[in-house]
Design a protein with these regions (language model features):
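Short acidic-aromatic active-site loops that bind/stabilize oxyanions
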Residues: 1-2, 54
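Single conserved hydrophobic/aromatic residue that forms the stacking wall/gate
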Residues: 2-13
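Beta-lactam-recognizing serine transpeptidase/beta-lactamase-like catalytic domain environment
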Residues: 11-53, 67-264
Length: 264
């Protein structure tokens, strides 16, 4: 919440509501809707915001962070870490909301269930080749680790256009990390890059679809035109194209699926 307010997003979240319902198996968009309250206090349609507006989506990305960690052998399925306040050189402390002062041993699924910031920070530090130790300085060179983390997030649809059959889709806002380790850690918990609601839907759908990222589509069929007020012959059925398969094993994907289920 503090990070959202600091970036001027707090009021936006109070004035807008957006929703996407998608079939993860074939990319069919079953429903897409949005509303926003304008400056005059009037409720307006904002369906287009689902693929033209972007937000920091917070802890929702943590499943993608784990997948990136698995891909790069930074962590293993079922790995246990201690959730604890992380104390860095210079007095910086970073912690989880569910466990602000204690020391709790959790595995990867439990990290998703509890929305552990610390598990994700420790994963990101391992990905950077600099595992956490109390009092350590933040890693100086995080450019390569940032690319690896973003590549993992891209594979599930975060930070890329979804390919929906509508114009003016935005890929989100992906700022240079410029070797800022604080921004790199924030990226691991969804507090740096911004994504569209449709990207978030594709991300969850990719995990639900066992790692296959499907191109979403509004249209279902194309028919030949006729001179009569009737539907012409079917020309083509629109099917969701497989855009990519995430570079993870079935066990790794299932681990994230189970962690998501434990969160609800």
């Amino acid at each position: 919440r503090d990070a959202q307010e600091s970036r001027g997003l707090g009021d936006v979240y109070k004035r807008q509501a957006l929703m996407v319902v998608q079939n993860p198996k074939n990319g069919d968009i079953l429903a897409i809707a949005g509303k926003q309250i304008d400056k005059q206090g009037k409720l307006k349609d904002y369906d287009i915001g689902n693929f033209t507006a972007q937000y920091t989506v917070g802890s929702s990305v943590k499943g993608g962070t784990l997948l990136a960690g698995y891909q790069n052998k930074a962590i293993n399925v079922g790995e246990t870490m201690v959730d604890e306040p992380l104390k860095f050189q210079g007095g910086l402390t970073k912690r989880s909301y569910f466990n602000k002062n204690g020391h709790v041993s959790i595995d990867d699924k439990q990290a998703l269930m509890h929305s552990s910031n610390v598990y994700m920070f420790k994963t990101a530090l391992k990905l950077a080749g600099d595992p956490y130790t109390s009092g350590m300085s933040l890693p100086n060179n995080i450019a390569d680790a940032g690319r690896k983390l973003r590549k993992g997030l891209n594979q599930v649809g975060l930070g890329l256009k979804t390919g929906i059959d509508l114009p003016n889709e935005t890929p989100g806002q992906i700022e240079p990390l410029t070797n800022n380790p604080g921004n790199y850690l924030d990226l691991a918990i969804g507090q740096y890059d911004t994504y569209t609601p449709l990207q978030l839907s594709q991300y969850v759908s990719t995990i639900a679809n066992d790692g296959y990222r499907i191109q979403p589509h509004i249209g279902l069929s194309i028919y030949e035109s006729t001179n009569k007020d009737e539907t012409g012959p079917l020309k083509r059925k629109i099917k969701g194209n497989v855009l990519n398969k995430v570079n993870n094993s079935s066990d790794e994907i299932k681990e994230v699926q189970e962690g998501f289920k434990m969160a609800f």
